[in-house]
Amino acid sequence: DVGLRNAQLNFRQQEENHIMENIIYNELLIRGFNVDVGAVEHSERNENGKVVRRRLEVDFVCNRGNQRYYIQSAFAIPDSSKMQQEQKSLVHIGDSFKKIIVVRDRIKLWRNEEGIVVMGIMDFLLNPNSLEL
């Protein structure tokens, strides 16, 4: 709960990105999902040309019955490099379940070239069917 977190920290840290993640997490629980943090193994070449394995985090892996969604929480995506960073873990998931990035800004829901849905937090919260869009 965001209020309990803030009280525990004596209202010293107002990290909006963590608060947004907490809000998304609580909403997913309210909607009846089992929610976990996910990780994806990915190999890439470093600046020396050596192949290195990286572990990429998925903020939320949401399961309810036979439904599964992968969700990234991104406070802001000001440019294409930030978009690549946020979607990197999602594009390396080897299944066809829906992948979603939720951002703080009010934006029109859209689907990028990787098939990832990008939506604003208000659309996510106010529409109980937002994950189906």
Which residues are covered by each model-predicted region?
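A cross-kingdom feature that marks ATP-driven nucleic-acid transaction machinery
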Residues: D1-L133
